[in-house]
C-alpha cells in the first residue's frame, strides 16, 4: 500500500473519529458514534499494517490477536459497575505505551543533520516520556482508588504543592540539559531520572485528590492519555495518532473543565492535584439529631399518592445493579399517570455520565433523564424524591455549611421536596467522608438495605 493511500485512509479514520465523538455526545446517537469509532480504528489498523514502512507484520498481528482476546474477555467479564476502574487501567496502558515508544524512538534514532530538527526530536522524546509516565502512575492510582484496593482518602504530604512545582522545575532543567548535551550516556541517565520523577509526580497528583472528586480525575486522565498518544504520534511521525491524541486530549480537558464548574472547583487545582482534601467534617450523628426509618410498603403507598416523583441515582445504584427494577418502577408509576423524572448530578457515580449509561442500559426513556441544572428548580413542586445510592451529590451541607469539605459544590436540592426517601445500606458517610444533614431532616425517611432488594420490595408492593 502506497504512502498516499495510507494518508488517505488516515484522513478517513480521523473524520470517523470526529463523527464518533459527535455521536457519543447524545444518548440517541451514542450507538452510531460507537460504530463510527470501530470502523475508524479498523481502517487505521489495516492502513498501518499494510503501509510502506511497516516491518515485522507477523509480530504486529500476534500483538493484535493477544490484545483482541484480552479485550473481548474484558468486555464479557467486566460489569457496568466496574467500568470506571477499567477506564482508568486502560488509560495507564496508553501512558506506558508512550513511555516505551519514547525510549524506543531515542534508541532507534540515527540523528538529524539539522541541529534544529534534532533538538525538536529530543524534545518530543523527553515530553512524550514525561507525559506518558505521569499518565501511567496517575491512572494506576485512580484504578486502585476506584476498585477499593487503595483508600479513597487523599494523601496529605507536607508542602505537596511545592513538591509538585519542584518536580516540574527539575524536569524542565533536565530537558534543557538533555537537549543541549551531546553525550549519549548523559542523555540516557537524564531520561531515567526524569522518568522516575514523572512516575512519582503522577502518583502524587492523583493520590492527593479526594475520593469525591474521582469523576473529574477520570476525565483528566482521559485528557492526559490523549496528549500521551499525541506525543507518541510525533515520535513515530504518525499523523493519525497525533490527530486522535489531540481529539482525546482536548475533549478530556473540556469535559474536566465542565465538571469542575459543576463542582465549583478550579480547573487549575485539578491539574495541580490535592483539591477536595479538607479534613473538616460537618458534625456527628449525635449533633445532627435523629433519623426516621421507613419500609418498602410505606414508600410504595407514598408513591401511589404522589403526582410527581423525582429519582436521583448515585453510585450505590450501580453497585446494587438496581437500575432494572428502578426502570420497572418508573414504568408502573407512569402507567398510573404519575410524572416520574430522573435528576442526574454531573459527578454522580465514579465516571462522567455513569448514571446516564446505567439508565440507558435499563431502557429508561431519554426524555425523562434530566441534568442537575434542568431539574433543580422543580424539587420544591415535587411530592416524593427517591435518593437511590447517592450521598455527597444531595448533601445540603454544600450550601449550608461553609466549613464543609464540599462547601460551594452545586448539589441536587432534594430536601426541598415534600418527602424524601433515602436508600442506604447504613448511616455511613459517602465517598467524600462527609456526614449528610439530609438524613436528619423532618421530611426525610431512611430505607435501609441493599438498593436492589429495597426497590424490588417496593415494586412488589406497587
Predicted features and spans:
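Mobile "lid/hinge" segments at catalytic clefts and subdomain interfaces of large enzymes
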Residues: 210, 224-268
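Transmembrane alpha-helix boundary signature
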Residues: 48-61, 73-83, 99-116, 179-183
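C-terminal ends of transmembrane helices
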Residues: 16-29, 68-87, 139-154, 200-214, ...
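Structural signature of hydrophobic alpha-helical transmembrane segments
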Residues: 1-14, 51-69, 121-136, 184-197
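Membrane-interfacial segments at transmembrane helix termini in multi-pass membrane proteins
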Residues: 247-306
Amino acid at each position: 500500500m502506497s504512502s498516499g493511500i495510507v494518508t488517505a485512509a488516515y484522513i478517513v479514520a480521523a473524520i470517523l473519529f470526529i463523527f464518533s465523538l459527535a455521536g457519543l455526545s447524545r444518548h440517541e446517537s451514542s450507538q452510531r458514534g460507537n460504530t463510527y469509532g470501530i470502523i475508524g480504528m479498523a481502517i487505521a489498523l489495516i492502513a498501518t499494517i499494510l503501509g510502506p514502512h511497516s516491518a515485522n507484520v507477523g509480530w504486529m498481528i500476534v500483538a493484535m490477536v493477544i490484545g483482541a482476546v484480552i479485550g473481548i474477555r474484558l468486555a464479557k467479564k467486566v460489569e457496568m459497575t466496574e467500568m470506571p476502574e477499567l477506564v482508568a487501567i486502560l488509560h495507564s496502558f496508553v501512558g506506558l505505551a508512550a513511555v516505551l515508544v519514547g525510549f524506543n524512538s531515542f534508541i532507534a534514532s540515527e540523528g538529524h543533520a539539522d541541529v534544529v530538527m534534532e533538538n525538536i526530536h529530543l524534545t518530543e522524546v523527553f515530553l512524550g516520556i514525561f507525559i506518558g509516565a505521569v499518565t501511567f502512575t496517575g491512572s494506576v492510582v485512580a484504578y486502585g482508588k476506584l476498585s477499593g484496593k487503595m483508600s479513597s482518602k487523599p494523601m496529605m504530604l507536607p508542602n505537596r504543592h511545592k513538591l509538585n512545582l519542584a518536580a516540574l522545575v527539575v524536569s524542565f532543567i533536565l530537558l534543557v540539559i538533555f537537549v543541549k548535551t551531546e553525550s549519549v550516556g548523559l542523555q540516557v541517565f537524564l531520561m531515567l531520572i526524569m522518568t522516575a520523577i514523572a512516575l512519582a509526580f503522577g502518583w502524587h497528583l492523583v493520590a492527593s485528590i479526594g475520593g469525591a472528586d474521582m469523576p473529574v480525575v477520570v476525565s483528566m486522565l482521559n485528557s492526559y492519555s490523549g496528549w500521551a498518544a499525541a506525543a507518541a504520534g510525533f515520535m513515530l511521525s504518525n499523523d493519525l495518532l497525533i490527530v486522535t491524541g489531540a481529539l482525546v486530549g482536548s475533549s478530556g480537558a473540556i469535559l474536566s473543565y465542565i465538571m469542575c464548574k459543576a463542582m465549583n472547583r478550579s480547573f487549575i487545582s485539578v491539574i495541580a492535584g490535592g483539591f477536595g482534601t479538607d479534613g473538616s467534617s460537618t458534625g456527628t450523628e449525635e449533633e445532627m439529631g435523629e433519623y426516621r426509618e421507613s419500609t418498602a410498603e410505606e414508600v410504595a403507598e407514598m408513591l401511589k399518592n404522589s403526582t410527581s416523583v423525582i429519582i436521583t441515582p448515585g453510585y450505590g445504584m450501580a453497585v446494587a445493579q438496581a437500575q432494572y427494577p428502578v426502570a420497572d418502577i418508573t414504568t408502573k408509576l407512569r402507567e398510573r399517570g404519575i410524572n416520574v423524572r430522573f435528576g442526574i448530578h454531573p459527578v454522580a457515580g465514579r465516571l462522567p455520565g455513569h448514571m446516564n449509561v446505567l439508565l440507558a442500559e435499563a431502557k429508561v426513556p431519554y426524555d425523562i433523564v434530566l441534568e442537575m441544572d434542568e431539574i433543580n428548580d422543580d424539587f420544591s413542586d415535587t411530592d416524593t424524591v427517591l435518593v437511590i445510592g447517592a450521598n455527597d451529590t444531595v448533601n445540603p451541607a454544600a450550601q449550608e455549611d461553609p466549613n464543609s469539605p464540599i462547601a460551594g459544590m452545586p448539589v441536587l436540592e432534594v430536601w426541598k421536596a415534600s418527602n424524601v426517601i433515602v436508600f442506604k445500606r447504613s448511616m455511613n458517610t459517602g465517598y467524600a467522608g462527609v456526614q449528610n444533614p439530609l438524613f436528619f431532616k423532618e421530611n426525610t425517611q431512611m430505607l435501609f438495605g441493599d438498593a436492589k432488594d429495597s426497590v424490588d420490595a417496593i415494586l412488589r408492593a406497587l
